[in-house]
Amino acid sequence: LGDVYKRQIQAQVLSMMSDLRDKLGTAMIMITHDLGIVAQVCDKVAVMYAGQIIESGTLEDIFTSEEHHPYTKGLFGAIPNLKVDARRLSPIEGLMPDPSNLPSGCHFHDRCPHCMDICREQEPAIYSNGTHCIACHLYDGWDGKKEETT
């Protein structure tokens, strides 16, 4: 019952913030782990890990693209989805690194299911298709278009 009231208050606050943003013609920065809020109020999204932006794009880029940083995939994998027949959620394994002693290379490599040697050694460049940017060695050479296989 308590969660119902929390959601109602949250919806009212978000509505007031959106109205104020529209009335003043200004921008708003929303910092949250709640992807439902992101989907409701954001036009552009930046996903951060260990203090760095590892993926950014339009709301559509982040919520509908098949290409994602492994951390972003993990965030979506930890959300219940009634449209997908999944027996279990797939949360991100491991713990955040110590911010005072970040690992070399990609800061996510210790938790990444796709970790390669280069991930441990070299910080990834930012790969972009114009509106969607991903900082991950998996996307080296990515132009935003899915390669067709024959």
Can you annotate each of these PLM segments?
Residues 1-5:
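Short, small-residue-biased leader/transition segments that mark boundaries at the very start
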Residues 9-87:
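P-loop NTP-binding/switch modules centered on Walker-like glycine-rich loops
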Residues 58-150:
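Short catalytic/signature loops enriched in Gly
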